[in-house]
């Protein structure tokens, strides 16, 4: 692999050093990003670039196929699980125009630009496919403060467009390796088959997992099923030559929809904790690896024809085309959508110019593009070196760096300039859900208490507790009685938190005196942990 080491070739010790360095960089970069209000991907790329300057770290290379087959399903699954199925359905037209139309338009524009600036034609086509999708992790990390509809469109686009881009990538790489070209009609047919097959695979896996989880009430086994789900969906679709990305998305949306009725609370808490940590480390590590590749990409380009100046001009030109294509597409499709709505006499959703600017500016590229670039084969079918492979990796690295550093850091300023209306829908829906939940508790209490044979005095105590919660949820916060009740409950909450700390100290002291075992300590600690989490984030104190 051009003299470069993979992680395992220098032995387990060096591999462990790499893992420790990666995790440390992810943790430090994320903490600093939150503290100084800088998008964590920005600092992670910079920290990766510094690691890449260290000789042995600079030689480490992650296989692009590993990212596409191991990391991508996990990332897409968790992002899909945190995306609103209803919002995707309501904004499906816009998401499809972005995740298919914009991907193809970007691929064509980048390919033409690269070819015009001297890149080999097949390599230019591959570069266009690699840079065509936005990145789900980048959007989630850098655009999370956007209003719900704008964020849903960006998230939905970034989840689905990987499928479109990977089809383009497979076709362009195959042609570059020596396969016969493919016409527009055949390409459209491949897209249709890929998406329909991916949808069917996702529905099948999602349905099977739902049936299994209805019959299993064990957090560990359900957690294992949760881990297997994205990979099963991805592999099934890939084996059918269909979109694994779409299969993962569909399986996740199926489980998102049926989850509240088939997944138990303990299993949900455990699975969410696992996926939070796993995707945090995967996403962060991939951003660090983006940075690690930059010094090596510069070294490789410096020794080729035209050297670094030519490659830099090409990379900056391609970056400009990527950004400009997105801006033009957002403006054009908005006008087109309004025209179609008027023709069909449908209500038109008004999207102001400033809001369109925010959407246009949020087209970050990320680790998926880098993984695709690294997955470009070293040679063609004839044994000749793959044309401009190092140049592809360099250009992709620069585009990722510029979009994340420039667009990512300036996006908050653009959002403030846009003066986007406050998203009150989420708060209204949250209030509606809490009100209905509180009323349901009051209505159900007599029936449940009667079924369990609860004593009348205990029922009255529970009724008072639920009524107080309902008052806080339903009443106007400006009401003096409600305000007094809220203040009293907050004081009770703080007292309970303080008492919990003394309980912990007492139990820990017993363990330190060898009067109880560590297992007993952990059992009590688990119960106190749950109580503390509830007290730290109470529903009626938000």
From Swiss-Prot:
Pfam families: Na_H_Exchanger (PF00999). The keyword Ligase does not apply. The keyword NAD does not apply. It is found in: Cell membrane. One of its GO terms (molecular function) is sodium:proton antiporter activity. One of its GO terms (cellular component) is plasma membrane. One of its GO terms (biological process) is regulation of intracellular pH. The chain crosses the membrane at residues 12-32, 57-77, 94-114, 123-143, 168-188, 191-211, 216-236, 243-263, 277-297, 313-333, 358-378, 391-411. Keywords: Antiport, Cell membrane, Ion transport, Membrane, Sodium, Sodium transport, Transmembrane, Transmembrane helix, Transport. Its main location: membrane. InterPro entries: Cation/H_exchanger_CPA1 (IPR018422), Cation/H_exchanger_CPA1_bac (IPR004705), Cation/H_exchanger_TM (IPR006153). It is a multi-pass membrane protein. Belongs to the monovalent cation:proton antiporter 1 (CPA1) transporter (TC 2.A.36) family. This is Uncharacterized Na(+)/H(+) exchanger Rv2287.
């Amino acid at each position: 692999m051009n003299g470069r080491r993979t992680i395992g070739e220098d032995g387990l010790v060096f591999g462990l050093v790499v893992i420790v360095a990666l995790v440390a960089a992810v943790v430090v970069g994320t903490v600093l990003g939150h503290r100084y209000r800088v998008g964590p991907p920005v600092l992670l790329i910079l920290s990766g670039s510094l690691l890449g300057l260290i000789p042995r770290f600079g030689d480490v290379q992650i296989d692009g196929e590993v990212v596409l087959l191991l990391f991508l399903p996990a990332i897409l699954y968790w992002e899909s699980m945190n995306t609103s199925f209803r919002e995707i359905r309501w904004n499906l037209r816009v998401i499809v125009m972005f995740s298919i139309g914009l991907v193809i338009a970007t691929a064509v524009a980048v390919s033409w630009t690269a070819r015009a600036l001297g890149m080999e034609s097949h390599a230019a086509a591959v570069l266009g496919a690699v840079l065509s999708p936005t990145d789900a992790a980048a959007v989630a990390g850098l655009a999370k403060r956007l209003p719900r509809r704008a964020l849903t469109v960006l998230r939905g686009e970034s989840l689905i467009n990987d499928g479109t881009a990977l089809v383009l990538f497979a076709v362009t790489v195959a042609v570059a390796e020596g396969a016969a070209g493919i016409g527009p009609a055949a390409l459209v047919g491949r897209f249709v088959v890929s998406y329909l097959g991916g949808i069917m695979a996702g529905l099948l896996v999602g349905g099977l997992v739902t049936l299994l989880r209805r019959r299993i009430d064990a957090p560990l086994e359900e957690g294992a099923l949760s881990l297997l789900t994205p990979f099963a969906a991805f592999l099934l679709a890939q084996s059918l030559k269909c979109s694994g990305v779409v299969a993962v998305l569909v399986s996740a949306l199926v489980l998102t929809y049926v989850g509240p009725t088939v997944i138990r609370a303990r299993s949900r808490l455990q699975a969410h904790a696992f996926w939070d940590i796993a995707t945090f480390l995967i996403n962060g590590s991939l951003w660090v690896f983006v940075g690690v590749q930059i010094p090596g990409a510069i070294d490789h380009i410096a020794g080729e024809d035209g050297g670094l100046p030519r490659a830099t001009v090409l990379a900056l030109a391609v970056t400009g085309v990527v950004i400009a294509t997105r801006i033009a597409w957002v403006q054009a499709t908005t006008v087109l959508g309004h025209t179609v709505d008027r023709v069909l006499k449908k209500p038109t959703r008004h999207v102001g110019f400033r809001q369109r600017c925010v959407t246009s500016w949020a087209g970050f590229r990320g680790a998926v593009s880098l993984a695709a670039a690294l997955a470009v084969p070293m040679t063609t079918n004839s044994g000749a070196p793959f044309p401009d492979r190092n140049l592809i990796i360099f250009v992709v690295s620069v585009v990722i760096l510029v979009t994340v550093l420039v667009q990512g850091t300036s996006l908050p300023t653009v959002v403030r300039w846009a003066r986007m209306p406050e998203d009150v829908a989420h708060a209204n829906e949250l209030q509606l859900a809490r009100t209905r939940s509180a009323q349901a508790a009051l209505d159900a209490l007599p029936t449940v208490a009667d079924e369990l044979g609860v004593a009348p005095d205990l029922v009255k105590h529970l009724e008072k507790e639920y009524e107080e919660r309902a008052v806080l949820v339903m009443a106007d916060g400006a009401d003096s009685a409600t305000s007094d009740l809220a203040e009293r409950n907050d004081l009770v909450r703080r007292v309970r938190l303080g008492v919990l700390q003394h309980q912990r100290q007492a139990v820990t002291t017993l363990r330190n005196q060898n009067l109880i075992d560590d297992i007993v300590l952990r059992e009590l600690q688990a119960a106190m942990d749950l109580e503390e989490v509830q007290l730290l984030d109470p529903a009626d104190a938000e």
